[in-house]
């Protein structure tokens, strides 16, 4: 999760840093608070209940107020898990954890796109498009297209790149990174 988010944001010219929200100090850059709701583990096929694939459900949301997009992101792990389960349920636990962690990182990057661009608009392709399939999230490469990168900040990655600090109160028992 952390590595995927860092890789996606680096392409947009940002550096990410993860902090405990109870212990953070002032930051030079943007502070974003994330909340991971639900069970962020993908079950093995033998442990499956009656999970129904989700369609039209938001797997990630960013708070808004008065037309502004606020630095508060929510990832619905239950919806994301249901989306990924058919694709990875027979894989070993480490592979399922990796797929979920990478997918959470991609959803977080998508939501950060909205905050950093201060736009609810979506390009037609890439990581900022409006809808993801489980297959999109499982792709080896699923990145921002050029229009999304331009909207966020067209600055090249340099040592003094703006920092995005992510504080999470969500807990992931599997230790995804």
Question: Which stretches of residues belong to each language-model region?
Answer:
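Metzincin-family zinc-dependent endopeptidase catalytic domain
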Residues: 1-108, 112
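Metalloprotease/metallohydrolase-associated module, dominated by Zn2+-dependent proteases
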Residues: 2, 67-103, 115-177
